[in-house]
Amino acid sequence: ASKYACQVVDPNDIYEVDMDIYAPCALGATINDITLEKLKCSIVAGAANNQLENEEKHGNEMMKREIVYAPDYLINAGGVMNCYAEVHNFSSKQVMEMAENIYNTTTEILELSKAQNIPTFLASNRIAEQRLSKESRK
């Protein structure tokens, strides 16, 4: 830990540690009524599925507390793309081109959230629904 200027803490105490980013990468529902009150970060961005115990309630509360939330399926997009690429024998270059678009999607979600004053989970759901609707009409 000292090599990276980090501090090891008990997992039960993690929510009360001052940090920039909380990255839940294993267990879902770690953002709940109890932990959200303790959370001391400005960003939640992790690979765990279903990080918010109650998406609407906790997503809205994080917005009120000015905590930026990167939805799980946005963070997981690279892994999903890689699986798809393996099945369809895409080249490394093709996979990287697909993955580079995650940044653009993240920016789009954050901008929509800000413009419409809605939580990022809702902005990402709206964008996903629009894309699925567009694809289904093809």
Language model features with spans:
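Adenosine-phosphate binding glycine-rich loop
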Residues: 42-138
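Rossmann-like adenosine-cofactor binding region
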Residues: 1-71
